[in-house]
């Protein structure tokens, strides 16, 4: 704690490799964390592969900062750190204080890991570790164990000062949200689409969400589930816009006039056409879906080819080759799985045929679609859409979830 504030040090991830765009990525990372923590007036700086964060020294500010760091894309790890002057005396004093605190918490052994980023410093990394470790060992606070220590004390000698920290928490890696443009996620209430959205967020893309419902055939709880999923994604992406479109009249028309095996695929074709209009309105440059090849009948190669032909925008399918167990594991890690398994149907499961078409031809499906004269219904669905802006929330109020 320095000057009444709490310091955090984070290791910047993949963006440090992008030399041509490095400063742009650093600025975006600074901006993202500053926006996440705007309620507590943080000081954020990124330089030389490290993110430096200073927040007020209060429980609420520290809780908010640590929760935001746990959702921040673009860092590989972070820790609460102690800043001190770049002298061996100051570094040793701070390290001894860390060791004493660890001993009070019941720790018995330690190891020093030192890194000298400033090559002008008077000691090498190994010399720093050796000298500081010797002082702690001789003081009797902790015993040395280089292989299986109870605590590791990290020392980093940076350009302007030194930082010491103990437990380092794992970051989410990836790229800062916002450096890769904007996409529109077709968000259902299932397990897959939220994971697909997270995958694109982790590649630096800002995502907005589109949900299709068929009220009263789908219950209000189904939409509430999707709203909760969008709130989770907004924590990783800072914010999102959720657009809700009713497909009730379109599904009635399909149920009455379309060939039964083609029902689901024709509905997907309608979704893609509406999604393109929503995407262009929101300046999204691509559509994102949770489709995984051959996972269900509507996701055969031929069916995906048909739906891709319904839009001029690229369709990103980040889960196309993913294993279902891997998808579930990711959903659990990011906090969407428990929401996704709530037992409420979405519009895609309504009126689903027992024997859906598996190997359609694009031309044949386009003929079927055109014969149904769905244009006015699609226009009505788009015209009556509803939008909600959702912001990521961080802090003490979130801790009970």
From Swiss-Prot:
SUPFAM superfamilies associated with the record: Adenine nucleotide alpha hydrolases-like (SSF52402), THUMP domain-like (SSF143437)
Domain THUMP intervals: 63-168
Positions of ATP binding: 186-187, 211-212, 268, 290, 299
Reactions mediated catalytically: [ThiI sulfur-carrier protein]-S-sulfanyl-L-cysteine + a uridine in tRNA + 2 reduced [2Fe-2S]-[ferredoxin] + ATP + H(+) = [ThiI sulfur-carrier protein]-L-cysteine + a 4-thiouridine in tRNA + 2 oxidized [2Fe-2S]-[ferredoxin] + AMP + diphosphate; [ThiS sulfur-carrier protein]-C-terminal Gly-Gly-AMP + S-sulfanyl-L-cysteinyl-[cysteine desulfurase] + AH2 = [ThiS sulfur-carrier protein]-C-terminal-Gly-aminoethanethioate + L-cysteinyl-[cysteine desulfurase] + A + AMP + 2 H(+)
Enzyme class: transferase
GO BP, sorted A to Z: thiamine biosynthetic process; thiamine diphosphate biosynthetic process; thiazole biosynthetic process; tRNA 4-thiouridine biosynthesis
Pathway(s) it belongs to: Cofactor biosynthesis; thiamine diphosphate biosynthesis
Cellular component aspect of the GO annotation: cytosol
Assigned EC number: 2.8.1.4
Keyword annotations from UniProtKB, A to Z: ATP-binding, Cytoplasm, Nucleotide-binding, RNA-binding, Thiamine biosynthesis, Transferase, tRNA-binding
Entry's localization field: Cytoplasm
Molecular-function GO terms, alphabetical: ATP binding; CCA tRNA nucleotidyltransferase activity; tRNA binding; tRNA-uracil-4 sulfurtransferase activity
Family that this chain belongs to: Belongs to the ThiI family.
PANTHER family: TRNA SULFURTRANSFERASE (PTHR43209:SF1)
Protein name: Probable tRNA sulfurtransferase
Organism in which the protein naturally occurs: Treponema pallidum (strain Nichols)
């Amino acid at each position: 704690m320095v000057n009444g504030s709490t310091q955090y040090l984070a290791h910047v991830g993949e963006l440090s490799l992008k030399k041509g765009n490095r400063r742009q990525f650093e600025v975006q990372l600074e901006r993202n964390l500053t926006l996440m923590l705007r309620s507590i007036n943080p000081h954020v700086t990124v330089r030389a592969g490290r993110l430096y964060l200073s927040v007020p020294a209060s429980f609420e500010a520290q809780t908010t900062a640590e929760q935001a760091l746990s959702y921040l894309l673009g860092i590989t790890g972070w820790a609460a750190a102690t800043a001190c002057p770049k002298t061996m005396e100051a570094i040793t004093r701070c390290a001894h204080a860390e060791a004493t605190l660890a001993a009070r918490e019941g720790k018995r052994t330690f190891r020093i890991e030192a890194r000298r980023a400033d090559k002008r410093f008077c000691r090498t990394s190994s010399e720093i570790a050796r000298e500081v470790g010797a002082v702690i060992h001789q003081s009797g606070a902790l015993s040395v164990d280089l292989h299986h220590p109870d605590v590791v004390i990290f020392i980093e000698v940076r350009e302007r000062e030194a930082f010491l920290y103990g437990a380092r928490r794992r970051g989410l890696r990836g790229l800062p949200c916002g450096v890769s443009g904007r996409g529109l996620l077709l968000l259902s209430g299932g397990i897959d689409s939220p994971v697909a959205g997270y995958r694109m967020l982790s590649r630096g893309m800002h995502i907005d969400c589109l949900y299709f419902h068929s009220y009263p055939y789908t219950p209000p709880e189904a939409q509430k589930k999707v709203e909760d999923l969008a709130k989770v994604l907004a924590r990783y992406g800072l914010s999102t816009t959720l657009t809700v479109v009713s497909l009730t009249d379109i599904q009635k028309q399909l149920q009455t006039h379309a060939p039964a095996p083609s029902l689901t695929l024709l509905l997907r074709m309608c979704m893609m056409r509406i999604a393109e209009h929503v995407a262009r309105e929101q300046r999204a440059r691509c559509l994102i879906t949770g489709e995984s090849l051959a996972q269900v009948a509507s996701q055969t190669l031929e069916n995906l080819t048909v739906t891709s032909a319904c839009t001029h925008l690229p369709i990103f399918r980040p889960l196309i080759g993913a294993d279902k167990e891997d998808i579930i594991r990711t959903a659990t890690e990011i906090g969407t799985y428990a929401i996704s398994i709530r037992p409420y149907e979405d519009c895609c499961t309504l009126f689903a045929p027992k024997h859906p078409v598996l190997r359609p031809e694009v031309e044949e499906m386009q003929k079927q679609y055109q014969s149904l004269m769905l244009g006015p219904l699609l226009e009505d669905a788009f015209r009556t859409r509803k939008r909600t802006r959702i912001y990521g929330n961080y802090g003490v109020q979130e801790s009970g979830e």
